[in-house]
Amino acid sequence: MQLSSYTELREQLLAGSLRCEEVVRSYLERIDAAREDNIFITVFHERALERARMLDRKLAEGGTVGKLFGLPMAIKDNIAMKGERLTCASKILENYESVFDATVILRLEAEDAIFLGKTNMDEFAMGSSNENSAFGNVPNPFDKSRVPGGSSGGSAAAVAANLALVALGSDTGGSVRQPAGFCDIVGLKPTYGRISRFGLVAFASSFDQIGVLARTCGDAALVLEVMAGKDERDATSSAHQVDSYHSMMERVSPEGLKIGVPQEFFTDALNADVARLVLATLDDLRNRGAELVDITLPDSAYAIAAYYILVTAEASSNLARFDGARYGFRTSEAADLAAMYVNSRTEGFGREVKRRIMLGTYVLSAGYYDTYYKKAQQVRRYFQDQYRAALQHVDVIAGPTSPFPPFGLGDKTGDPLEMYLADVFTVPASIVGMPAVSVPLGFDSQKLPVGMHLVGNFFEEGKLLGIARMMQRA
């Protein structure tokens, strides 16, 4: 069963030519056949089938069905589902079961979505390759010697490999968009606060945002409509009006659009194939009536430095709760309480997580707080002002999702700084909190996926997805 979009699936379900149970069985069979790829950490065989049967009965009895009736979805394993494992791909939470549902889970279930399982990821969402998981690597579906991107690599691979029609991920600095670019799918990070973070395990709370990975911009818009909105359990969620993103997307046309193209993004450091595909897509839009506007974001190179100071500082605070005393892994080698804390964290956390905790603790320490953390917050505000100013004159800011195509497994694990640069084009949108999307452009000369990255103004996801949809069709 190969479905191109949820719209296609919904038509067949409502017409009776397909049943939810039939669809779910097909997906579960493919998931089981691909088990060696480590895409899923937990698969909900019985739960998914029981829900599918319930939805089939609901339709047969003439009940009103939800906006996402029968949509088979995968969930990144840092989003809470009551009664299911919540591992964050870490040894320290390997056997932890959530006692509540995330707000997004409740909202999706209320509209009749079906969850197939929890996907692999970089541990605690820290990574750009899905190589930091305690459950093993995830290969790229288009070349199994290469990475799928991260940290939502399992979710991206699930959609690309046709193991789910849509997946949820989380995006802190590019963790939805970069793997989407590496896996030839759409990856949306909404405006910060557009979707409730209640039930999302925190990495960096002022950056984290739940996002959507899908085959089409239309599917991403439908899922966003359901998840968006104020939540009393998340003080950072916004009460801004939830639009009909799918309808808004359909109304966008290239005539009169102004697309900002930062010259700083197109340097000799950018892979030649990536540059060629991005520029060809922009030229196509110009030929269809859009205006390409040269803009300058002169200090973009400093975004990565500010980002890693801020997110590691927040991570060192957020991850202090995993101490072996309250829940999760506890060491068996401890002579006293202090040793239990130290050994539980040493044994339970992976190398990259420990590296970031140490960096964060350092930048928050006495004597360095003003030099690093405070200065990085000032840089963050500077970038917010810069992007606000740019988007007063253009509709979106366009560039590559990644400076290079998917790289080989193990190629960058020995050089953390090189790995961090994989997010150089996605980090600025996270720093400023604006919505951004990666849209697939096709394949390079090595038959590897390439993505285009678009940043829009606050709460303009409908327009952003409409422009992305035109590029996907280019």
UniProtKB/Swiss-Prot annotation:
Q: Which PROSITE patterns is this protein grouped with?
A: AMIDASES
Q: So where does this one cross the membrane?
A: none
* Lineage top rank: taxon: Bacteria
Give the keywords, sorted.
Answer: ATP-binding, Ligase, Nucleotide-binding, Protein biosynthesis
Gene Ontology molecular functions: ATP binding; glutaminyl-tRNA synthase (glutamine-hydrolyzing) activity
What GO CC annotations are associated with the protein?
A: glutamyl-tRNA(Gln) amidotransferase complex
Return the Pfam families for the record: Amidase
Spell out the InterPro entries in the cross-references: Amidase (IPR000120), Amidase_CS (IPR020556), Amidase_dom (IPR023631), AS_sf (IPR036928), GatA (IPR004412)
Q: What is its EC number?
A: 6.3.5.7
Catalytic activity reads: L-glutamyl-tRNA(Gln) + L-glutamine + ATP + H2O = L-glutaminyl-tRNA(Gln) + L-glutamate + ADP + phosphate + H(+)
State if Protein biosynthesis is listed as a keyword: yes
Q: What positions does UniProt annotate as the active site of this protein? A: 76 (charge relay system), 151 (charge relay system), 175 (acyl-ester intermediate)
Mind listing the GO biological process terms from this record?
translation
Q: How does it assemble?
A: Heterotrimer of A, B and C subunits.
Q: Which family does it belong to?
A: Belongs to the amidase family. GatA subfamily.
Q: What does this protein do?
A: Allows the formation of correctly charged Gln-tRNA(Gln) through the transamidation of misacylated Glu-tRNA(Gln) in organisms which lack glutaminyl-tRNA synthetase. The reaction takes place in the presence of glutamine and ATP through an activated gamma-phospho-Glu-tRNA(Gln).
Designated name of the protein: Glutamyl-tRNA(Gln) amidotransferase subunit A
